[in-house]
Amino acid sequence: NLTAGTEYQAAEATLRLLAASQNQVKDSAGYLATLARLAGNTGKTDYWDELINRTVRKDGFADERLRLDVYRLRQVVGITLEADEIGDMAYRANQAGLPAEAQALLDDGFKSGLLGKGTNAAADQKLRESATKAAAQDRATLADSEAAAQKAANGNALVGLGMALSSTGAHERGLALITQGIAKAGLRRADDAQLHLGLVALRAGKADQAKAAFAAVQGADGAADLARLYLLHIDSP
């Protein structure tokens, strides 16, 4: 529909003008809100990129701790990661006890030709070998890990194992374990667990469950900001 398309472009142009004026007068909150409308209404990755970058730079955002989650969000909204970002994301996933996630990232990076060349070639290959070996060990000890997690006094191990399972593609099983872990309580970071529950529900194709999980994320260290951006993405046309 040509008329609808023209109206759509006019609305985007109006929002861009508003964003420009807000940026000029240093109205950071207003600019961020307008960026969110642009990203949500158009789905354009340029807007999403700027929105995520601005969100991460907010005061109090735990960027170092949440960097892996920021990378995940960037991928979900369709932003293509650069070679150094893929390497960093894989390194952080491996450090977080998610070698299967790291291996998948590295395998894709090597396949696309982004990784394994230049000055980082040796480091990329070493990380890939390490992640591949650790992922194989995880798969071999899965039953024992789950039994130990079920017996634990708190839900931390269940949440971690749920994320690990999801990173192998077993999203339904991962979702069940994270849900059990949250119910068991005693979590080190309950909001992070809730954020990860939403992510795994989204991976499993359960949008309503993902929305409920993201809506429950609280706190002021950045997890709730990421959850709100996931909600914006889910509700985008």
How would you label these PLM feature ranges?
Residues 153-237:
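C-terminal soluble interaction/assembly domains
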Residues 22, 55-56, 92-93, 165, ...:
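Residue at a conserved register position within TPR or TPR-like alpha-solenoid repeats
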